[in-house]
UniProtKB/Swiss-Prot annotation:
Domain PH: 292-430
The protein's name: ADP-ribosylation factor GTPase-activating protein AGD3
Major localization listed first in the record, in broad terms: Golgi
Organism of this sequence: Arabidopsis thaliana
Ranges for the ANK repeats: 728-757, 761-790, 794-825
Regulation: induction: Up-regulated by auxin.
One annotated GO molecular function: GTPase activator activity
Gene, per the UniProt record: AGD3
Keywords: ANK repeat, Coiled coil, Developmental protein, Golgi apparatus, GTPase activation, Metal-binding, Phosphoprotein, Repeat, Zinc, Zinc-finger
Length: 827
């Protein structure tokens, strides 16, 4: 108790005064504290505005998914961080509101109401005390002879004033007691409540960022990998530039030390057999509308006017036999073609960057071209010949192209450059003459019909890499084997990515790929290449911890280069729904658990009590489930020998022959089938033939084998298919290269198929592709480590086989020639 006695006494008055002084000091302190708290809340408000401004700036900087510049530096990834930043800003705004309500408002109320009430009570007490003193003096100053009614009135006034005085005194005591009581809890409660608000603020922020930690780590890892790749690419670029400088120096020294003149000879010069073959192969590609650049670079051209001045022009020799040049330097286009105007020489017999750029401009601009980007048609080489040196000119490195309509005098920049131009033009003329292409079928200009190619043959990224690989391969196979009937079901074109469609959009259309294969989270944006499933970012972190021997995790949005046509074809053939029927078969079929021979008693009990997690479950639950699902194969039903009359190897062979990716996938997962299984001559080659094993009488079996083989040869018109008599030592990859498609080859490679395996004839899968015109599969094998220098039993390499089998794909030929020493590119 603050007041032991309530009697009005000097000690009581002194105690009141002391408490009032303490209350006034507390009021001043409270107001100062309030000013500091208000400044703090204003700072929180400014910090919230700063957070929102930072998030908005990051969102603007990151751009959108359709912005190519944004995608190049990871803008879509950064945009995801803006959501977290805005959420953190919201937490900060909530903190500011709580501090203002819990601390600022209570401080202001305590100072302006509770402490102010003490002052008001003191004023009322002083006024009542004065009134009471006056009434008491009047009453005590009465004489004895005062009338009774006057005395009664003064006595009543004294009683009233005393009551008012006592009431005012107790009101002051109440106000002071209230202040003293609130001192014990008001400030502690306000400050501790403020700290609790801070605790919740930081806890919410931690939980939010902790949930994003796997994604942040993935982005950091990807950024580090990108840094390493960039350093490697920069070093490779520097090496290329140094090599270019060394090549220029060698050419300069060769030109200065060599002949001052030019080689003599008229007409068509003899060129190397290998170079002639390669030029001829590229020339043949023009028949399918694929225009390739054989040679391009700068030449000086003498004008036909009286002055005969020389002007530097950029000439292009393409696979249609056309030689044309640019009147002016190319205007800077969008895309990779922007650097062509500064390029002296380019790769030959390659992909033809300039023709690609011209083609893309034709399709992209509807044939309307600026003068700066239009190539001027020069000459049809079919009716032309070459003469070395200029007519009546003592200049070095000159040569002439003589045609029925016009003569062109050209000057190269060195003797080596001159010889190379003459060799390439001579080779083109020889190829044109040998093929006897009618004059009227040749395009009239570089911008003519030769460039009006279909979308599937465009050189853009979307069309060149993703447009109908199965269809293209089948057309090539028909041209090699002479098929006349309709293609079988196994070679029907699969679903492919439409032009401009992103891999993530195409793969999410596959059954079950709209949800994570492991937890069911919507819109998964990560994938396991070898498992063929789409997973969310949280499950992808668990997959990464399993190791690449179990799951090869890649991002659908970050790892753009991974999503080749073969990988996309494989994913479209599988899907999360099918993959889970293999990996979770026992999980959804409890009755099969008791009959699975591969499960122990403890494993069976684990399967019975284990359930599939949801995306809201803790990461530890998902880790245990994914570990059991893929690493331990706890929910996979093991294949038994009694399930099928055939061996696992024979089933694999039949599935690959039938292009049944799902069956191959199931056999690999269920029975750990050997993808490097080698076909034995004593085994059968197809599901139809394998059924003959069940026939009891051997003579009848042999008759059926012979009849089926003859029917097979009658249908195809060729004996190139793998058969029991001619497939000794063939691997599953050999079989896939001949009978399956790109996705099947990708599936076998993902599970460790030997890309350089050879059969009894020494033929590798690459050799088989070249023999049968499998263009896309040949490209895939070369990019996955196929050895172009491997020889068969006859000592022939892949390039030799391609030359003999009239294989005409320029990209594959360029890859083969680079390895075998036929690289004719001028750096």
């Amino acid at each position: 108790m603050h007041f032991t006695k309530l009697d009005d006494s000097p000690m009581f008055r002194k105690q009141l005064q002391s408490m009032e002084e303490s209350a006034e000091i507390l009021r001043e302190r409270s107001l100062k504290f309030y000013k500091g708290c208000r400044k703090y809340t204003e700072g929180l408000g400014e910090a919230y505005d700063g957070d929102i401004a930072f998030a908005s700036a990051l969102e603007t900087f990151g751009g959108g998914h359709n912005d190519p510049i944004s995608v190049a530096f990871g803008g879509p990834v950064m945009t995801k961080f803006t959501i977290a930043l805005r959420e953190i800003g919201t937490y900060k705004e909530v903190l500011r509101s709580q501090v203002e309500h819990i601390l600022n408002d209570r401080l202001l109320q305590f100072a302006n109401m509770d402490l102010h009430e003490v002052k008001e009570a003191r004023k009322r007490f002083d006024k009542a005390s004065l009134t009471y003193d006056q009434a008491r003096e009047k009453f005590l100053s009465l004489r004895k002879g005062t009338k009774s009614d006057v005395a009664a009135a003064l006595e009543q006034e004294l009683h009233t004033s005393r009551s008012m005085f006592e009431q005012a005194r107790f009101n002051l005591v109440t106000a002071l007691s209230n202040v003293e009581a609130k001192k014990r809890f008001e400030f502690l409660e306000a400050v501790s409540g403020t700290m609790d608000a801070h605790l919740r603020y930081f806890k919410q922020g931690y939980e939010l960022l902790h949930q994003m930690e796997p994604y942040i780590n993935q982005v950091l890892t990807y950024a580090q990998q990108s840094r390493e790749r960039s350093n490697y690419e920069q070093a490779a670029l520097n090496e290329k530039m140094q090599e270019y400088k060394r090549q220029v120096d060698r050419e300069s020294r060769w030109g200065s030390n060599g002949s001052n003149g030019s080689p003599n000879g008229d007409g068509i010069q003899a060129i190397g057999r290998s170079s002639h073959k390669m030029i001829d192969a590229v020339m043949q590609s023009a028949a399918r509308g694929k225009v390739q650049t054989i040679r391009q670079g700068y030449l000086s051209k003498r004008s036909s006017n009286l002055r005969g001045d020389w002007k530097r022009r950029f000439f292009v020799l393409d696979s249609r036999g056309m030689l044309y040049y640019y009147r002016k330097q190319c205007s800077k286009p969008s895309g990779s073609g922007s650097q062509l105007s500064g390029q002296r020489n380019s790769s030959e017999l390659g992909s033809g960057l300039l023709s690609r750029w011209l083609s893309s401009n034709n399709h992209g601009h509807g044939g309307v071209h600026d003068e700066k980007s239009v190539a001027r048609h020069t000459v049809n080489l079919l009716t032309s010949t070459i003469k070395v040196d200029a007519d009546q000119s003592d200049l070095r490195f000159c040569f002439r192209i003589i045609s029925p309509t016009k003569n062109y005098t050209l000057q190269a920049e060195s003797a080596l450059d001159q010889m190379d131009w003459i060799e390439k033009i001579t080779g083109v003329i020889a190829s044109l003459l040998s093929s006897q292409v009618p004059e009227q079928r040749l395009p009239g200009s570089p911008m003519g019909s030769g460039h009006h190619r279909s979308a599937s043959e465009s050189s853009s990224y979307e069309s060149s890499e993703y447009d109908h690989p199965t269809t293209e391969e089948f057309v090539c196979e028909r041209s090699f084997l002479g098929y006349n009937e309709r293609p079988s079901r196994s070679f029907q074109p699969q679903r492919s990515i439409r032009k401009g469609e992103k891999p993530i959009d195409a793969l999410r259309k596959v059954c079950g790929n709209d949800k994570c294969a492991d937890c069911g989270a919507p819109e998964p944006d990560w994938a396991s290449l070898n498992l063929g499933v789409l997973v969310c970012i949280e499950c992808s972190g668990v997959h990464r911890n399993l190791g690449v021997h179990i799951s090869k995790v890649r991002s659908l949005t970050l790892d753009v280069k991974v999503w080749e046509p073969s990988v996309i074809s494989l994913f479209q053939a599988l899907g999360n729904t099918f993959a889970n029927t293999v990996w979770e078969e026992l999980l959804h079929s409890r009755s099969a658990i008791h009959f699975d021979p591969g499960l122990t008693v403890s494993d069976k009990s684990r399967v019975m009590v284990t359930g599939k997690p949801s995306y809201a479950d803790m990461i530890s639950i998902k880790e245990k489930y994914i570990q059991a699902k893929y690493a331990e194969k706890l929910f996979v039903r093991r294949s038994r020998d009694s399930d099928f009359p055939q061996s696992a190897a024979q089933q694999m062979w039949d599935a690959v022959s039938g292009n049944d990716k799902k069956a191959v996938y199931r056999l690999i997962v269920n029975g750990d089938a050997d993808v490097n299984y080698v076909y034995d001559q004593t085994s059968s080659s197809s599901l139809t033939l394998s059924r003959v094993i069940l026939v009891p009488e051997r003579p009848k079996r042999e008759d059926v084998l012979l009849r089926l083989r003859n029917e097979l040869l009658d249908r195809t018109g060729s004996s190139s298919n793998i058969s029991p008599e001619g497939s000794g030592g063939s691997s599953l990859l050999h079989c896939a290269c001949e009978k399956a498609d790109l996705g099947m080859v990708e599936l076998l490679l993902q599970y460790g198929a030997n890309v350089n395996a050879s059969d009894s004839s020494g033929q590798t899968p690459l050799h088989c592709c070249l023999l049968r015109g499998k263009v896309t599969i040949a490209r895939l094998l070369l990019t996955r480590g196929a050895d172009p220098e491997a020889m068969n039993r006859e000592g022939k390499t892949a390039l030799d086989i391609a030359a003999e089998s009239n294989f005409t794909d320029p990209e594959v030929l360029a890859l083969l020639s680079d390895t075998n020493g036929y690289n004719h590119r001028q750096c």
